[in-house]
Amino acid sequence: MKSLFHLLALAALALAPAALSAQTMPVQQPTPPDAAHRFDPPWNAPAQAGEAFTVYGIDNVPDLYGDVVDPQLVVFFGGNQFMVLDDLLREFRKAYPQYQRIFVETLPPGILAKQIEQGGALVVGNLRIALKPDVYAAGKSRMNMTPEWFARTSSYAQNRLAILVRKGNPKKVASLRDLGRPEVRVSMPNPAWEGIGKRIEDAYEKAGGAALKTAVMTTKVKAGTTFLTQIHHRQSPLRVLYDQSDAAPVWYTEAFYQAMLGHPVESVAIPEKENILANYVAGVMKAAPHAQAAEDFVTFLNSPAGQAVYQKYGFLPPVK
């Protein structure tokens, strides 16, 4: 299975400096993947100037996004929002054209927090990046762990859970309780560093009490029928698409996006009484190297243009 190392693999290409035009350094698209990697990310079509060298299964870095050289804004986003970036940054640049070189990471929020604690350093394969974020955005519970980091925070979106299954739902998964069945292979975010993992555990207890949580998170982990991911927003869809897992509890927007892509998946709704809401919060870092850019970006998230992007991808409006 594609691990964090596989999905992020080696170095992302730094974009050409802003002085180089698209005429001298044309936008290129990566070579389409072969059948064995036909569902591999990145799932967007990045319009970046430079020599395209994405090799699926080898050199493929979907969660490091944009300019690593002299960025004017650095954002650490919880990974489940990766799908908004193309539209969100395009609209942000329209509203604030002074910011063109932007670097974004969309990794699990717990990993991003560890990176911040190490001065912004991240090692992927042979690549080391050391960029301090201007903005850190994650679920409210994660943000509440480190209030001392932020000059200010702002809620900008909400989300809820769904269950991702293959087209046709071959195991007939109808509810969270079905994930406790021994024959249903589950892809589950690791609660150790993925905030969604703990929220899904809460949902298990709502749906089936401690017995369901124990079945999925203890009994089936030992049996090998629950797989704990390192980066669920990439691994869980891939495991379902490649028939390595039968079902994956995910954020609704992740299932929604896979359907937008035309991938052969379906979404199983979770009733409100068993579901949970996530409140996404963005914080301007006190130590932001680009403080004004951080302020402008967090303000933009709640602007009509910013909110329209989140609505397009199935997110709910923020807590008022």
Model region roles, listed by residue range:
Residues 1-4:
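Positively charged n-region of N-terminal signal peptides that target proteins for export
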Residues 22-103, 107-114, 126-132, 140-141, ...:
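Exported/periplasmic ABC-transporter solute-binding proteins
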Residues 7-18:
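Bacterial N-terminal signal peptides
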Residues 136:
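Conserved hydrophobic/amphipathic secondary-structure segments
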Residues 12, 140-143:
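Generic internal hydrophobic packing segments that stabilize the cores of diverse globular domains
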Residues 117-125, 145-149:
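N-terminal post-signal-peptidase region of extra-cytosolic proteins
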